[in-house]
Amino acid sequence: MRIPRSMTSWLSMLLAGGLVALGGQGAALAASGASRPAAAAQLACSEAELGQAPAGANAKPMVIPTLRDWTGGNGTLSFDAGSRILVDPTDAAALADTATQFQAQLKTVSGLALPIVSRAATPAAGDIVLSLAPCGASAAQLGEEGYSLDLEDHAVLRAKGAAGVFYATQTLLQMLSLDGAAAGAHLRVARGFAVDVPRYAERSIMFDVGRKYASVDFLAAYLRFMGWYKLNTLHLHLNDQAKAKDGSWGLRAFRLKSDKPEFAGLVPADGLVYTRDDWDKLETIAAAHHVRIVPEFDTPGHAGAFAAANPAIAYVGDTPPGGTIDPTKPATLQYVESVFGEFLPWFRSSTVHIGGDEVNVNSGSITTASQVDYLNQLGRFLQSRHRRVEMWGDASYLPRLDKSFIIQRWINWGSEASINWADKGYQWTESYGDWYIVPFGPSYFNPDGIKGDTLYAKWSQATGANAPSGGQIAVWNDNALLDSYTWERKVNDLLKDAVPAAGQVFWRGQEHDAQGQTVDYGVLRRSVATLQYGPDVTRFSDSPIPAR
């Protein structure tokens, strides 16, 4: 029998062994059976959180990504119109946005419009508690994004930071969504205790918006979609060029627009740009879903937009001409630093990407040494502005390249395909070419998209010293002018199936059963068929993620 809410508050105080200290008026309220007290001490740790609760019968919920550790309880925890979202008062400011976001998502999933209570209050049956005070052995394991989830008479979501609490809310919402009830009326979850931490620090999707502009609304939808599956980085490749059918540069584009006249030449011929207001909107949505936006200005190669805006720094050895800027000219570094300096105040991410790939070195005036010197100097400029530097890897840059740079490995041929950048002293992210999508491109760049089953089965299972610190799947638009297609239809259709799988392999890796056998992705796909794009995305309602 479920104990009435009016009684649960007082019983929980007694059972917690001093969770709430009562005196004077509080003691009188307790004796009379009146409403909850106005003050409570810090929420006590439960037996499950301290590792002292016996395991029950409930199976591990098949949320995506799957949980690292699960101790099943018995029975279910239900929420109703009397439930509340309780925020530990000491964490009220830090968790205000997370609580509000969760409140809105929970209403979509369950139909419940629950109040947020940030004053001290004792949890009653069916309440949901958000706290930045982790318990027991899990406290040392959680890092910046991990969390614990205790589901008994009420739900307690704990983490060391707001990101971890957000991810705990996404897990709880997914558990609700998988309860078998009608859409918008999910009210029950299995009881149990989970501890969950990510495999990779960087869990990324990259969009080439330089060659093909993506609307703000499309990017906003993907930020929400990514947060649902615990992906935390949207890498935007903001400048590039695309060839016309005659082989010339039909488009050379940089997608950010400054109001200053000295940067007017960077506005592309198609006029499709992101203004400061556009960028601020995306950053706000990203923050709500704990996704960071990493901007990339790719130079000295892929820099046709910079060459068009400032012809004096163009490299003359290109075919076709006008796609590269000359790293040997002092004016080149000065100009690129000025562009970064103009837009750095827009960016909330501590990391910026400087490109650095595919330059026609060792011909004309450009050598490998001059390329590396340019990249090192640009990187030091950005570091002086308190930014971390990320770039595309190239083994020819060794050993001169600054070891503080984060490397994205992308080359999937020859000896470089297996290079371990950690052995060379670098933090690195796996961005292997096998996980590119190039619409209308060659077969080895997945022109028909990436299936979640393939990504799940074939992504590297390396651990320890051989493992990267992050993973990324990418959409490149090399053929933007050769075929007519849109982000909303073509690109989403090619990418959508891989997004939940990317969340799985970047956060958890492959799932294994009790016997240590790899769980087939088809089992996880059954959950994806229900979870879809998440409670915040309606844009792709006519393009569901397939059930098989």
Residue ranges and their predicted role:
Residues 142-323, 331-333, 341-351, 477-479:
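Feature activates predominantly on carbohydrate-active enzymes
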Residues 203-207, 234-236, 293-297, 352-354, ...:
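Hydrophobic faces of well-ordered beta-strands that scaffold small-molecule active sites
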Residues 401, 413-548:
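Flexible, acidic glycine-rich loops studded with aromatic residues
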Residues 31, 36-195, 389-396, 403-405, ...:
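Acidic, contiguous N-terminal accessory segments
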Residues 85, 106, 161, 205, ...:
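Conserved, mostly hydrophobic/aromatic
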Residues 11-23:
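Bacterial N-terminal signal peptides
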Residues 306, 311-406, 411-425:
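Active-site neighborhood of glycoside hydrolase catalytic domains
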Residues 1-13:
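Bacterial N-terminal signal peptides that target proteins for export
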